[in-house]
């Protein structure tokens, strides 16, 4: 992945980063804090990673026992990096978790709804100034993406 750097998972594993201006990776401090808060919910969870960038949050979830990660981003470089990172982490798990990446325009994709098993945790880290929070949260709520006990975590500018 030209132009990309490397990230590290909390366990030390190195991951690829898309680099450039296509993604803003979640800092290791924020990742650790979020994962510590979500720890009781991660084992066997279904994780939806919206605006996934490098896929590092999905990788953290996999490393902590998620059984399924779906990473969604509209940038092709981010999807390539995310797919590579998720595959590397999933390969170390047995039984192998389900991983999937989707290159999609987020709002229209979410508005189509979801016909499969809902997600337990949604992690949403959009570009801060693109007005995605409200329409995406509404689409998540209306589109069978969530169940009664689902958690939605939104990263935003401090």
Positions of PLM-derived features:
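Class I S-adenosyl-L-methionine-dependent methyltransferase catalytic core
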Residues: 1-158
């Amino acid at each position: 992945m030209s132009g990309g750097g490397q990230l590290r998972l909390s366990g030390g594993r190195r991951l690829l980063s898309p680099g450039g201006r296509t993604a803003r990776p979640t800092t290791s401090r924020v990742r650790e804090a979020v994962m510590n808060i979500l720890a009781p919910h991660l084992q066997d969870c279904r994780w939806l990673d919206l605006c996934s960038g490098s896929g590092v949050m999905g990788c953290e979830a996999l490393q902590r026992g998620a059984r399924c990660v779906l990473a969604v981003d509209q940038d092709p470089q981010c999807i390539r990096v995310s797919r590579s990172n998720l595959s590397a982490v999933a390969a170390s798990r047995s039984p192998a978790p389900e991983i999937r990446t989707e290159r999609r325009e987020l709002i229209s994709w979410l508005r189509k709804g979801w016909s499969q098993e809902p997600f337990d945790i949604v992690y949403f880290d959009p570009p801060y100034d693109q007005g995605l929070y409200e329409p995406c949260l509404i689409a998540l709520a209306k589109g069978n993406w969530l169940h009664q006990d689902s958690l939605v975590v939104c990263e935003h500018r401090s």
